Amino acid sequence: MEGRGPLATSPRRRWLLLLLLLPHSHQRIQDPPAVHLSSASGQGPVTIMTFDFTKMRKTSSSFELRTWDPEGVILYGDTDPHEDWFMLGLRGGRPEIQIHNHVARLTVGAGPRLDDGKWHQVEVKVLGDLLLLTVDGEEVLCLKQVFGPLASRPQPVVRIAVGGLPFPPSSLRLPLVPALDGCVRRGSWLDHQAQTSVSALSGSPRSCGVESQPGSFFPPGAHAEFSLQDLPQPHAEPWAFSLDLGLQLAAGSGHLLALGTPENPPRLSLQLQDQKVVLSSAWGPQLHLPLVLGAPLQLKLAASGVTLSQGPETEILALPLSDPGSLLNLWVQPHARLFLGALPGEAASASFCLDGLWAQGQKLDMDRALNRSQNIWTHSCPQSLGNDTDTTH
């Protein structure tokens, strides 16, 4: 009866005991932190890697993606930026692949929407002349005869860029806005053993550790500008123009928006002051409403005045009809702007989250702004305002 005592165990049980006794950190190596896909400069990728394809034994890349942003570049690869490149991005929230080489030139969209703020597992695999795209374990795209042999390339180098393009977006087969307000984690890029270089762009990328919700977040001092010529135009008879803001979070004091030109004080402005929303004009009078977060804030502009309303509260600001500098004349000036956030030169402490901004009922996209601060979260907001939300890209 040797080996049948109370301490005797089968080999399988001994392995289970060892696994249970190991510290948790030994059971799984800690994952590196998630990386935000917006670079500090707002231009180009966050990481560029090169690989010697003569040494590659693995021709797939996988990662997890989380975003509320429906459009942007996730991954780009090439052996020649003019003649042989590949791009994986989002358009309308769904994956899109663009391929440009001597074998195939195509743009294909496939798969489910990924802009829901959840983590999604994505894998891109090249098998000979085939490309496979898998999302959350399900194959959503199989492209055949789209690649030639790597051995035919003049240089044995494959370049991978994460979160951007090494050339202008106009050079894509179907241009899109490259900046993607999203996070990537657990990335495995081609064959690590064949990697010859890796470079991360300078600057402090935004943290992915903050829980987010859909919207657009302006940290203190952030600003964006839209040309009035690029916005939906006012109704002609009678003249009317509307702006609607979904103000979800707000703190501090400073401008929310203004109408005017860069070289002059604004004709009309909306500010945060002491938990109030204050509407001011260049003609002196102003009015205010108590700040109510979550309730739509609406500005209705007419020739005779401006109506500010939020929920049941409504105030009307009268405007002079004969002034040549009236609001109506702004729309015929080529440099007239809709300013969001801090005005040029303003030391503002206001930070706020918009879950939407509409001009004449049409939602505006921060990626389409004439110019903007790079620390604006274009398609996401923190769940609450605090010190950890003032980070920049």
Swiss-Prot record:
Alphabetized CDD domains for the sequence: LamG
Span of domain Laminin G-like: 35-208, 215-381
GO terms, molecular function: steroid binding
Gene3D superfamilies: 2.60.120.200
Subcellular location(s) per record: Secreted
The entry's keywords: Disulfide bond, Glycoprotein, Lipid-binding, Repeat, Secreted, Signal, Steroid-binding
Transmembrane segments: none
Signal peptide: 1-27
Glycosylation site residues: N371, N387
Disulfide bonds: C183-C208, C353-C381
A family per Pfam: Laminin_G_1
GO annotation, cellular component aspect: extracellular region
Function: Functions as an androgen transport protein, but may also be involved in receptor mediated processes. Each dimer binds one molecule of steroid. Specific for 5-alpha-dihydrotestosterone, testosterone, and 17-beta-estradiol. Regulates the plasma metabolic clearance rate of steroid hormones by controlling their plasma concentration.
SUBUNIT field: Homodimer.
Protein name: Sex hormone-binding globulin
